[in-house]
Amino acid sequence: TRGAELENPEEERFSKLLCNEFDAEEVNLAINGGSNDRIVRNLLVENNIEDYDLAVIQMTFPVRTEFFKDTPSTKFPNGKWFKQPKQAKDAWVKVSPKNNYNKWLHGEDGDIARLGEKFKDHSDFWKYYYMHVTSVKYFETKEKIHYHTIRNSCKIPLVLLTINRWTKLPFDLQLDDGTRQMKHKNGHPNKELHKHYAKQIREILR
């Protein structure tokens, strides 16, 4: 979790509170709207998990994803093409439909009229993908693949969390109980709820 909607996320999010308890250094790689695809990429490609003592990984809604946007080439007057170097991690584009899509997908009251608003690139493609290509079964399978990939790849102590209240998988901790208690306007946990999560994770680690 990045700590969205907190006044001071770097100090108030549960990952920081947990590290304070153990007198440990926090390494938080979360971004707003990140996907399980991004988690697995960071776990298998961008980082070496064995450099750490403990992993607390919060999976998210399986409808989210990402794609790699290559750096465009520029043609100079001499006719030669030059490709501006850019770090690969900066070229990954997140794809995160509004939460109403999750509700609609699972047969709940979710208005998807504005589905494409959060798609910065290829909006028509992603709208078609989410409306006509994917399904609950598809996303459940995708989540299961990510879940077991993380479990099997993490060779250090791991606490695996989720905010997906529709999941059927045995996570160590479910962070969404379906209510809006102790949550901010946009549904993110407030300072007190982050304290509660840190306490729950400590109990799991005992």
PLM regions and their residue ranges:
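Serine-esterase "nucleophile elbow" of acetyl-processing enzymes
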Residues: T1-R38, N42-N47, N190, H196
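Alpha-helical cap/lid subdomain in secreted, periplasmic
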Residues: L44-R206
